[in-house]
Regions:
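Outer-membrane beta-barrel translocator domains and adjoining extracellular loop/strand segments
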Residues: 3-8, 70-74, 103-111, 149-157, ...
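Detector for outer-membrane/organellar transmembrane beta-barrel domains
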Residues: 178-317, 321
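Short sequence motifs at beta-strands and strand-loop junctions characteristic
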Residues: 29-37, 72-74, 118-121, 159-162, ...
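Outer membrane beta-barrel
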Residues: 1-10, 25-148, 161-162, 166, ...
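Membrane-embedded beta-strand positions in outer-membrane beta-barrel channels/transporters
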Residues: 39-43, 79-81, 126-128, 166-168, ...
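Transmembrane beta-strands of outer-membrane beta-barrel proteins
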Residues: 56-60, 91-93, 136-140, 167, ...
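Flexible glycine-rich, low-complexity coil/linker segments exposed to the extracellular/periplasmic environment
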Residues: 4-33, 249, 253-261, 265
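Outer-membrane beta-barrel "beta-signal"
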Residues: 362-376
Length: 376
């Protein structure tokens, strides 16, 4: 059926809701096909002379993914950063993965969505400090937003005049011959948003919204298999390509209503995924399972049954879950695979004042994807 995603469905999230025409036919129940090469990427790793007593390096990486659906096939920036590396400290300045994305532990699926909407997915301009202590890493990131932003764009974060902050702690241990690995990590993030500066009634406003997010990951790798697990809980996870966002806060104040100067309340989301893969050099089998739940808000929402009160992804969805097996074949620099995806979104016809969705009807979709990679 038709799906919610970006880049002509290449970055797939979940199936579209049922939409009946005048004859009660679901117009979204339509099988589709596509063929794209927009994930073609180019990367340059740069190494230069020492500076400030540190080793210097940098990365520039782009792809033909475009920045919007309208610019698909256009070249866009993925990573662009410089790094200063001392004995136990790194300083990274530029655009790279958000602090909630653990490069050491994410689903090894074929699809470009990397497990969304169950897995945080965002790249941000940032300043990042990495402190290493034996098997531990402590990472502090202060970030802005670019391609992965709030509902309506990055203005909400920029208007707050404060960067998004993320603190991450991880433990990674290998055995002597590095055939076994244990990785455990956790992160906590905080951001302030000012979604607008003027109301629809042309009154200045500076109402803000605070949002927190937390995540945990675990990975165990042995010679034959790799097992990974992740859990996320957060407010306004829209910029992480997950369910969530924020809504207008309910009020009975007549002046606030007359001016349209509403406050905001974040929507809460919990998500988890489990990924398993074999580690063969020529053939690998993997299985991903994911679940996400819309928990609504802790405060009453203005006109809570109206879509206009929400600035969120999946505001009328109670849950999403996915089961996705994959078969991967490897030969030299070539990798190809077939991946199945069964995703169910629970759309509700009733919503209470806290944005909690009920009277849910599951809507499912089956997706089959073939991928071909050539690495050079």
């Amino acid at each position: 059926r038709k799906t919610v995603g970006i880049r002509e469905g290449h970055f797939y999230l979940y199936p579209e809701n049922i939409k009946y025409d005048a004859d009660s036919v679901d117009v979204n129940a339509k099988t589709t096909f596509n063929f794209l090469s927009i994930q073609t990427r180019l990367r340059g790793d740069i190494y230069g002379p020492d500076a400030f007593g540190a080793k210097t390096s940098g990365v520039i990486e782009g792809e033909f993914y475009g920045t919007t659906d309208a610019s698909i096939n256009g070249f866009r920036l993925r990573h662009a950063f410089a790094k200063l590396s001392w004995e136990s400290t790194d300083l990274v300045i530029g655009q790279t993965w958000h602090g909630m994305f653990f490069e050491e532990c994410f689903p090894e699926i074929m699809a470009v969505n990397t497990g969304c909407p169950f897995q945080p997915f965002s790249r941000n301009p940032q300043i990042k400090i990495v402190q290493k202590l034996k098997d531990f890493k402590f990472i502090l990131s202060v970030m802005s937003q670019r391609d992965f932003a709030e509902w309506g764009g990055s203005d909400a974060l920029r208007n707050a005049a404060l960067p998004e902050v993320n603190l991450r702690i991880s433990y990674q241990h290998f055995n002597e011959d590095k055939t076994r690995e244990v990785f455990v990590g956790g992160s906590a993030g905080y951001k302030v948003l000012v979604p607008r500066l003027v109301t629809d009634s042309n009154y200045a406003t500076n109402n803000s919204l605070n949002a927190y997010a937390f995540s945990l990951v675990f990975k165990y790798r042995c010679p034959k298999v790799t097992f990974k697990l992740s859990g996320v809980y957060g407010e306004d996870l829209y910029s992480q390509t997950m369910l969530g966002g924020y809504a207008l806060k309910h009020t009975t104040d007549s002046l606030t209503i007359a001016r349209g100067d509403y406050s905001y309340t974040p929507l809460h989301t919990v998500a988890s995924w489990l990924d398993f893969t074999t580690n063969g050099s020529k053939f690998r089998f993997g299985l991903l399972g994911g679940f996400s739940k819309n928990l609504g808000s802790f405060q009453n929402i203005l006109n809570w049954t109206s879509e206009k009160s929400y600035f969120a992804r999946g505001w009328n969805i109670s849950y999403v879950y996915r089961i996705s097996p994959r078969f991967v074949f490897i030969s030299g620099k070539v990798k190809m695979g077939i991946e199945g995806d069964y995703t169910v979104a629970g759309y509700g016809s009733e919503i209470n004042s806290l944005g909690e969705v009920s009277n849910v009807k599951p809507v499912s979709n089956v997706r089959l994807m073939y991928s071909f990679f050539y690495f050079f």
